[in-house]
């Protein structure tokens, strides 16, 4: 079984990818989606969202990272995929739509998720310059997964994708449970490439596996709220200390960055002191503020700590 870290825009940046992959259990991760409109993007845009490209497209823990593209112009997608391949990207992830409103609002996934003739050249041309192309997609906005979607997936496979990541939810359904895992089983039967179940959390994972027959998963919010979830699933070995260490590294990074609460940067929030690894990490994610905008915390024998610890 393989476990991937979901590319949640505005949350999973290079810092969280580094921290989560250090805990262990994650086989590969994906960047936040790079929006492709009508032109070839500058290299700086790729470096901004994928700074790991300077280190061989791997996190500091050595976890491979894929580059995700979002757009509706197959030719422009192919052009940017070729540039990413020149920069050394090991795989291109084509986002054909996910339940996130920012992904489906502008029709970025429209032609790719509903038109067989459109998604084929897009995926094939993107797969050409790179070693392989991965498809991360959802069903057509507002349409139940039953209606013709396995045919679209077959078209993607014919275009050269190496695996498919399926949300099993529509735009209207969003992230509300339950997901249509029975249609994930139909997709798995229709294609000859690995299929991943894109899950919000690790809860009821066995139910998803039993219904769909899919072993591989992509985890999002569940990994952010519990950093050792992938490790626990893969090795059946919960490790709260790893989560606590990740939170401490996050706090030290915040202290060295000099950010202040309210600046719009998630990174400006330090770690709340606690004896529980999960409480530590959740305090980080919930953006617990400092006592004042100019508070720099305090230095103790154990290192930097926030003022209230």
UniProtKB/Swiss-Prot annotation:
Q: Record's Pfam families? A: Dus (PF01207)
Q: Where is the active site?
A: 98 (proton donor)
Concerning InterPro entries, the annotation shows: Aldolase_TIM, DUS-like_FMN-bd, DusC, tRNA_hU_synthase_CS
Instruction: Tell me the enzyme class.
Output: oxidoreductase
What are the residue positions of the site described as Interacts with tRNA? 35, 95, 175, 267, 286
Cofactor(s) recorded for this entry are: FMN
This protein's UniProt keywords: Flavoprotein, FMN, NADP, Oxidoreductase, RNA-binding, tRNA processing, tRNA-binding
Q: Which CDD domains does UniProt cross-reference here?
A: DUS_like_FMN
Task: Tell me, in a sentence or two, what this protein's role is.
Answer: Catalyzes the synthesis of 5,6-dihydrouridine (D), a modified base found in the D-loop of most tRNAs, via the reduction of the C5-C6 double bond in target uridines. Specifically modifies U16 in tRNAs.
From the Swiss-Prot or TrEMBL record, give the protein name.
Answer: tRNA-dihydrouridine(16) synthase
